[in-house]
Amino acid sequence: MLRELIATLKAVGKSTELHQTDDGTRLLILPYGGRILGVFAPGSEENFLWTNSALNSVESAQTYYASDDWQNSGGDRTWVAPEVDFFFPKFPNVDIAGYWQPRSLDPGNYELTKTNHGVKLTNRLNIEGFRSKKRVELEITKSVAAAPNPLRYDAAIRIDAIEYAGHTLLTSLRILDPDPNDAPLVGLWSLTQMPHQGELFIPTYSRTEPRIYFGLVDTPPDELATSDRLVRFKMRAAGEHKIGVRAAITTGRIGYIYPTGNQHALIVRNFFVNPSGEYADVPWTEPEDRGYSTQACSVNSRWGMFSEMEYHVPAIGEGTGLRQIVDRSQLWAFRGSREDIEKIARALLSYEI
């Protein structure tokens, strides 16, 4: 799968970089869109992340990249929030028919450079806030580093029985305009796309009812469940469904388990949550309802069939006095028997799994 994917992208003029960390993890980096398109365990050709089926052949990839639609290659991407400010040109009209992904953001104009520690992606862009009626010039940088198996010293986990891949992602957002307070409120937004038909877990410090952004109307009653320390979201329904959890409640981890052949895979995102920060993303119809750090979106529609784990970084710009913010997170991915994967999930996420 890895070699075929690289060959297909090369054939349609999309350059890639295959970066290997010290533990043998391989990351397929696609500058077009600033994506970490693939995460591969040592010796494995199977991607832990979702890629668009249009990339399965040169012919379909050529057609896809020639279209005027938003081109979602897949993998892990970085956007900016609040969504309602930057993705709705006709605000306050927030009808989904008017939704528009700013092309300066995605695919953007990312440049890849090699550093002493690995690779770095940089995108400079101008973007308009349709709600704030302010424009801002930004710089987004992304670089990767190793992330050793967090359970490598845990004797209770059968390390040799599983495949592991992981990396650290260092992302920065910088306002290039002279006065950051003249800029709109803007924050980093991380979105990781994974194969559909799995179950997502958000550990919490106490019981909470997730905010439903859209969907989850005619879905089975067990699709979304909460307990004292965990939110569970089965991502298998048709359509698009999204939830969010406030920063003060979340632990800074999200996990997702999905079947793959006769095995199961677990992906965990480990990130820093600062409840004192200004989490700017809001539900589309309630633009003052702030404070959500952690989100999840199930997509089974014309955009593809994938599950997203999402997190936000406190905003900079208007009213904050901040010009720059740097975020550091880890992605840990495991593949093995269902028993082993659930044991790892209980260790890293919640005993309730």
Residues covered by each model-derived region:
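Surface-exposed acidic/polar loop and edge beta-strand patches at domain peripheries
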Residues: 1-166, 172, 176-230, 238-353
